UniProtKB/Swiss-Prot annotation:
HAMAP family: GmhA. Substrate binds at residues 52-54, 65, 93-94, 119-121, 124, 172. Its EC number is 5.3.1.28. The gene is gmhA. It is found in: Cytoplasm. This is Phosphoheptose isomerase. It comes from the Bacteria.
Length: 193
């Protein structure tokens, strides 16, 4: 009954992945992001991750697999997803939703830390403010974006951009794969300490 729709969805996902994979810059960006994160961890830094909606879930997923585990048992790495409901609701109420991530970065971000900002459009105002706050703190910035990178294009030390202009779920599918590969590479980098 829905087999054609299922095949179509899987084919579109595969095509989006193949398009991403065809650009060597994307492969290098994932590698550079993982190396930047591992260097921060080796220097006693941490990563703060943030996103909205499904990207918020990806930010939490990323932090959880760094502090917990990915595939193998190993020491946890210092990762915090900016997701505390009391912080988010307080800042949203008192300052506005555009400040929910930047206020947290201002409070706990330090020079040598890394911010991972995730936005499929690249236009999320609260992620842009978090990037600005991270820069003011001397932090490095990695972004996961989509389409043309939006307003976030060019704002990161490392940008992993999925150049898909359709629905956001295709971009998110590549983001989660990039996240998993980054964690795998971080583990390899940290094992060489």
């Amino acid at each position: 009954m829905y087999q054609d729709l299922i095949r179509s969805e899987l084919n579109e996902a595969a095509q989006t992945l193949n398009n991403f994979l065809a650009d060597e810059a994307n492969i290098l960006a994932i590698q550079q992001a993982a190396q930047l994160l591992a260097a921060s961890f080796k220097a006693d830094g941490k990563v703060l991750s943030c996103g909205n909606g499904g990207s918020h879930c990806d930010a939490m997923h990323f932090a959880e697999e760094l502090t917990g585990r990915y595939r193998e048992n190993r020491p946890g790495y210092p990762a915090i997803a900016i997701s505390d409901p009391s912080h988010l609701s307080c800042v949203s109420n008192d300052f506005g939703y555009d400040y929910v991530f930047s206020r947290y970065v201002e409070a706990v971000g330090r020079e040598g830390d890394v911010l991972l900002g995730i936005s499929t459009s690249g236009n999320s105002g609260n992620i842009i403010r978090a990037i600005e706050a991270a820069r003011a703190k001397g932090m490095k910035v990695i972004t996961l974006t989509g389409k043309d990178g939006g307003k976030m294009a060019g704002s990161a030390d490392v940008e992993i951009r999925v150049p898909h202009f359709g629905y956001a779920d295709r971009i998110q599918e590549i983001h989660i794969k990039a996240i998993h590969i980054m964690i795998q590479l971080i583990e390899k980098e940290m094992a060489s300490v």
